[in-house]
Structure formats: C-alpha cells, structure tokens
Amino acid sequence: MKNLFLFCRAGFEKECAAEIQQRAGELNVGGFVKANNNDAYVVYQCFEDDAADTLVKQLPLDSLIFARQMFAASDLLVDLPENDRISPIVAALSDVSKAGEVRVETPDTNEAKELSAFCRKFTVPLRQHLKKSGSLLAQENPKRPIIHVCFIGPGRAYVGYSYSNNSSPHFMGIPRLKMAADAPSRSSLKLDEAFGQFVPKEEQEERIRSGMNSVDLGACPGGWTYQLVRRGMFVSAVDNGPMDEKLMETGQVKHYREDGFRFEPQRKNIYWLVCDMVEKPARVAELIEAWAINGWFKEAIFNLKLPMKSRYKEVTAILETMQTILKENGVTDFKVQCKHLYHDRDEVTVHLWLRPNTAWN
C-alpha cells in the first residue's frame, strides 16, 4: 500500500499535512499530501509502492503532534455497490494476513459521523468475510495488526492496516472519557486525557499515585486540580481567582492567590507540575523552562495556546527552543512529547519528563 491515512481534528489538516510531509522526508519516504479543509483527515501518498508500510512501522504515532491515528491505506475505494460493499473491501485487503482486529470508522466530522450507525451494522458481516478470507484471525488478538476501514462518505472508503504496537488503542484515535458531574470545568478532561496519552497504563500506578505533591499554575476554578485531587495528590493551586469550594473542602488543596508566573514553591519535592494558562505560548514555555532548570518538578504537563497561522511551525520552534535552553543550562536528561489531544482545541498539550531513567525519591 502506498498511502498513509491520518486522522486529525477538523480544521487542522494543514498542520497535520505539514508535519507528515516533514517527518516522512526524515525517513526518506518521498510523497505528497492530499488534504481538504475540515475533512478531519490527511492522506500522504508515497511515490513508491509499499512505502506506507515503512511509515507505519518506523514513524512512531506518539511522536506526531497533530495525528490521532494512522494506517497504511489502499487507494480510495469509490462507488462501492450498495448490494455488495464487502467484496471490494475484502479484495483490497488481500495482502493483509491474520490481523487481530477490524475497525470500521469515519473521520471526526458531523457529516461523516452520520455514517456511524451504518458502520456499526456493517462491521459484523465484514468481520465474518475477513475471517473467511484469512485476513482476520478467528479470535481477536491485541498483538496482531489492526484492519481499518474508514468511510469518508457513502460508498467511499480507505482500507488498510496499522501495527498494534504503533497505533492508538482507541476507535478513530479518540479516547472515550466521561465528564465527572463534580468537576469544576470541562478543561478537566484535557488533563485526564493527557495522563492517558503520556503515561503508559503499566506505569501509572508508579508515576501518578496518591500522596504525591503537585502544583497547578493558573488553577482557577480547578479543572486540572480536580484530576490531581481525584488521584489522591496534594495540590498547591496557584491563581488570583477563586477555587471550587468542594475541591478546597477535600483538605488536599492549598490555594495561593498569586500570579503563576511569579510563584516559587516552598516545597521542592514536587512530582507533578501542571499548567493551563491563557497566555502566549512562548511565555508559558519560558516559565516551564525556569522550573525545569531549578529542578522544581519531576514531570510536567502544560498547554500551549496556538496562533491563528503557522501553528505547526510555531509549536515546533517553541519545542526546539525549549530543548536547546534546557541543555544549555545543564538539563540534559529529559523527554519531551507533544500532542493535539481530542479535548484540546486551539492548543496543544506538552509533557516534559526530567531524568526519566532515574527513580523519584
């Protein structure tokens, strides 16, 4: 297969396209992008047959900022007959053998999601035929490739596969999170999703645990503080504005009515630093850099608000500058990840982990 299909948020196709063009070039996989505004997906068409397999194997999905999910794809199947959509799809997947799962999906747009009910019904007979053809195992296997069938419109679909070790575990790359009734704001879901995105399940018990000390800069009214409290942490909530009363009643939160940019923690045994302030992204990055250079935290999650134009260029420039400044100031052992999360809008979420191979005392 020569195409790479990437899911993204509607309105961010240009950013996703610019990113995959650059990242594919770094792997010497030549090609060109096909993208339309508000389609919520991008297709990177490789010049060489089967080159998409190189990308789904060697380009880590977690290293892409704007792609939620990706899979190697056939050319677009069009005019699928209403009386037999299955046969052309099974034929297009003839080179896929013993996959462990099939997902029938759509892009994340209102128009495409009108096909959701059809996709659910269609999955059952398609699964049966794929098992008969040998493309799909009789029993689901989380270690085998995943077959993707993405309907972009009635009778029009991209089909292909991803590898389970380089793929989102979520349908369409979207985690299904529920808004807690007592959460102070919807922004709470951003940190909830970020923990799942940046901290593997098998490490969460060690890295996100009860009793840890944390700081929330720009905390009001407490959406992100809520997620820290829910996980049993003690929180220094820094904001001139008021905090949610129920959060304060937990006894786990100390409210500092201060400017987050001027706050200096009294305790230096802070594990988590979180920050979701409506500020220029470069200024927020400088703040996190200062905390990192001072060694005031172990892991940080923070949001960078995006400009209206050149969003991919701006984000990558800020992240590159951050890494340079940290290294120039003696902070050389760290890991940075960045993702445009489902619950993000005009922003991206960054994870900075200091000394990832050194245990926290």
Curated annotation (Swiss-Prot):
Q: What is the lineage of its organism?
A: Bacteria, Pseudomonadati, Pseudomonadota, Gammaproteobacteria, Alteromonadales
Give a GO cellular-component term: cytoplasm
Return the broad EC class: transferase
Homology family: Belongs to the class I-like SAM-binding methyltransferase superfamily. RNA methyltransferase RlmE family. RlmM subfamily.
- Tell me which species this is from: Shewanella baltica (strain OS155 / ATCC BAA-1091)
Instruction: Report keywords, A-Z.
Output: Cytoplasm, Methyltransferase, rRNA processing, S-adenosyl-L-methionine, Transferase
Reaction(s) catalysed by this chain, per the record, are: cytidine(2498) in 23S rRNA + S-adenosyl-L-methionine = 2'-O-methylcytidine(2498) in 23S rRNA + S-adenosyl-L-homocysteine + H(+)
The record places the active site at 305
Q: Which residues bind S-adenosyl-L-methionine?
A: 187, 220-223, 239, 259, 276
> What are the protein's GO molecular function terms?
S-adenosylmethionine-dependent methyltransferase activity
- Would the keyword Aminoacyl-tRNA synthetase turn up in this protein's UniProt record? no
Keyword Cytoplasm assigned: yes
Subcellular location(s): the record lists: Cytoplasm
Reported EC number(s) for this entry are 2.1.1.186
Protein's recorded name: Ribosomal RNA large subunit methyltransferase M
Q: What does this protein do?
A: Catalyzes the 2'-O-methylation at nucleotide C2498 in 23S rRNA.
Write out the GO biological process terms: methylation; rRNA processing
Chief subcellular location equals cytoplasm
Q: What quaternary arrangement does the UniProt entry report?
A: Monomer.
HAMAP family per the record? 23SrRNA_methyltr_M
